[in-house]
Amino acid sequence: YIQHELGFSHLGIADDEFGTADGLAYLPYHREGRRLDGVIRLTLDDVADRYGRPSALYRTGISVGDYPVDHHHDCRPQIGKIPFPPVPSFSVPMGVMIPAGTDNLVVSDKAISVSNLINGSTRLQPVVLLTGQAAGTLAAIAAREGCTPREVPVRRLQAALLAQDAYIAPLYDVKPDDPDFAMLQR
């Protein structure tokens, strides 16, 4: 389709990646795929300097990530090691799950609205699971209250997630059974 219908005849499957006759992996797996154009697009800059950014996305956190950027360039050793900035623990903002131009849809997993670089930190299972929990909770609140997901106030979603003992801010030294957990997570 991409080559014939869209006219990108120069695009195709890499023939030097997997060593198979058809160029496909032995087992199907998507490390990266299409990502949402969301209300918010989380970038490496947002995470590396979360408190110094004017957007203050950390205030709209609905899940937590704690993994460095890891991009693999095994096919192109000439690129060498890329010095990505260290990534502190971070919050994933609510807007990455909400499409910019579509109502009544919530996206989670690896398709959230993130840049290619920070995708290396958000694609891990702990982030995917927490974001999935937030997406399901957001959809349930919207359905129960008769509104679209984008109309649900972030504080309403955060309160529901905190009632489920979810982490929405990267404060790992305060456990859910701590009396101050919910207050510190806000």
What is each residue range found by the language model?
Residues Y1-A163:
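Flavin (FAD/FMN)-binding glycine-rich loop and adjacent Rossmann-like elements that form
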Residues L162-R186:
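N-terminal propeptides
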